[in-house]
Amino acid sequence: MVQDRLFQKAISVLLIAGYEVSERCAIRPRSFDLIAEKGGLLLIIKVSSPIDNVSEEIARDLDLIAGHLEGSPLIIGGRARDTDLERGAVYLRYGIIAINPETLYDYLVDGIPPLVYASPGGLYVNINGDVLRGLREQRNMSLGDLGAVLGVSRRTISKYESGMGTTLEIAIKIEEVFDSGVIESIDLLKYTSHFANKPQERLPVQALAVLERIGLELHALRRAPFQALATFEGEMILTGYGTAQKVVKRAGLIGNLSAITHTHAMCVAIDGSIRKKVGQTLIIGEEELHDIEDGEELIELFD
């Protein structure tokens, strides 16, 4: 019930903000639940409460999908362990931003970005180090002078000016001292991957060999409704595979996701001879793939 309410809140906020929202992904396993798009901006969204349920495996999928679709991964939740997520605060789960629906509303609808982020020990803010240094120098204050006023060391002030975050309490003191803003807001749509040397999953040998033979580059996923992202000369294909019965069930959802992300959708049936379109999705048998000469010929089948 809690999860359903979160879904409804998240979808409502996205629609109010003018986003086109995909169907809810109800297929298990799933690394994301929704994809939303507005003016070329893509959000890959996982709804989870508590946010601790988002595993590293799920986060890696979110990261990989966001990277290749040039989107921003986002976790929408209500709690972290036994604590409610605070409005206007950002939480991190394996480097993926997590917020509550109210913070999403403030950002997307009212244009109010969050200012604080949660970290062990409490809530923190980012300080604009260049602004802080400029204000300090205008007052002819040394690092030690400002440190004495704030009750911290000169080395800590130096770190603030180099970009280190601080507690909300200290940041407020700084702004009171200079009567000027130094706190930097957090851009929810600015994402930098925290995963290095991402392990590549291998697709089943036959499907992998056929698609690679015709020149496609493949990126396997573990928990998405499509098992791979395939690329060919700038064209992206959301690719699923499995028995004919299985891929027909997934074809509609994968097609809907491809429409939102402005990509192609393909399902490879490994147990039959078939080639047809179901909505946006090309369903093709593995045998038919063997007859395709190259990636360009495959792309033409989507038209």
UniProtKB/Swiss-Prot annotation:
The family database entries (SUPFAM superfamilies) matched by this protein are listed as: lambda repressor-like DNA-binding domains
**Domain HTH cro/C1-type, residue spans:** 132-189
Alphabetical list of Pfam families matching this protein: HTH_3 (PF01381)
**UniProtKB keywords:** DNA-binding, Transcription, Transcription regulation
Which residue ranges hold the DNA-binding region?
Answer: 143-162
Classification via HAMAP family: HTH_type_cro_C1 (MF_00584)
Instruction: Please give the name of this protein.
Output: Putative HTH-type transcriptional regulatory protein Mpal_0031
Origin organism is Methanosphaerula palustris (strain ATCC BAA-1556 / DSM 19958 / E1-9c)
